[in-house]
Regions:
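Gly/Ser/Thr-rich phosphate-binding loop
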Residues: 2-58, 70, 77
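Hydrophobic alpha-helical segments, especially N-terminal targeting/anchoring helices
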Residues: 74-75, 83, 125, 131, ...
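Conserved ATP/PPi-binding loop(s) of AMP-dependent carboxylate-activating enzymes
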Residues: 65-68, 79-116, 154
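Active-site glycine-centered loops adjacent to acidic/histidine catalytic or metal-binding residues
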Residues: 17, 41, 63, 127, ...
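Short, P/G- and charge-enriched loop/turn segments at secondary-structure junctions
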Residues: 55-61, 116-117
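AMP-binding/adenylate-forming catalytic core of the ANL superfamily
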Residues: 95, 113, 128-218, 235
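Beta-strand->loop->alpha-helix junctions that form or flank phosphate-binding loops
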Residues: 37-44, 48, 63-65, 175-178, ...
Length: 236
């Protein structure tokens, strides 16, 4: 644990790449006294949204847009999303102003791929978030990963974060499974702690815990227990 290390010289801590689980952030704070400052960016950009020094970090928030980018959250119709509404994170490009520093201009030998992300005077990240009344952003997930069930848009990360709070859960992945009438239903793939045996009662416990800690329609209708969850080479 952290108690075995001298962290007295540690002044700041930041994270990016994957959404930060709030439970992990709180455990880190208790162990070190530091708040992790989460941010958001892509290979195609520099950091776009961040909890900069001076911000009061809000649990689960990736912060506010950095000054160099005109970040806009757009709904499916291309309009600005209202506070609390999920939208795509984009960078507005004003032809009358200098091109945004740090934003790439094109994919190498990828004309069609470039056109897919640059249109309607915006660079489209393909990532979704929502914003609170004070302008703080909260990451939801990739547009392709958002689950559409019975007219609801469900972000996988929120459900994963809740299930990971259960003491007997090691890992969790949330995906959408095709459904004849609902379009998709939520599926939870779960890795349990050693010694914990899968059971129907455990499935019900996980489902009820999600219902109690999120909106009831977000609970996983399918729960599968596995020994491990496959990851890409960069750990995602």
């Amino acid at each position: 644990g952290f108690e075995n290390y001298d962290l007295s010289c540690l002044k700041h801590s930041v994270t990016a790449g994957e959404a930060l689980n709030t439970d992990i952030a709180e455990r880190f704070r208790k162990a070190t006294g530091l708040v992790i400052r989460e941010g958001f960016g892509q290979t195609e950009t520099t950091v776009m949204i961040a909890n900069l020094p001076g911000y009061d970090v809000r649990p689960g928030s990736i912060g506010k847009p950095v000054p160099q980018y005109n970040v806009e959250l757009l709904d499916n119709d291309g309009n600005l999303a209202k506070p609390g509404e999920i939208g795509e994170i984009t960078i507005k490009i004003d032809k009358d102003k200098e091109y945004p520093y740090g934003l790439f201009t094109e994919y190498y030998n990828g004309e069609e791929s470039t056109k897919e992300v640059f249109y309607d005077s915006h660079y489209h990240t393909g990532d979704e978030a929502w914003m609170d009344e004070d302008g703080f952003y909260y990451f939801v997930g990739r547009k392709d990963d958002v689950i559409k069930s019975s007219g609801y848009r469900i972000g996988p990360f929120e459900i994963e974060a809740v299930i990971l709070r259960l003491p007997y859960v090691v890992e969790c992945a949330i995906t959408g499974v095709p459904h004849e009438t609902r379009g998709q239903v939520v599926k939870a793939t779960v890795v349990l702690q050693k010694g914990v045996k899968p059971s129907e009662s455990l499935v019900k416990e996980i489902q009820n815990f999600v219902k109690e800690n999120t909106a009831p329609y977000k609970y996983p209708r399918i729960v599968e227990f596995v020994d491990s969850i496959p990851r890409t080479t960069n750990g995602k």
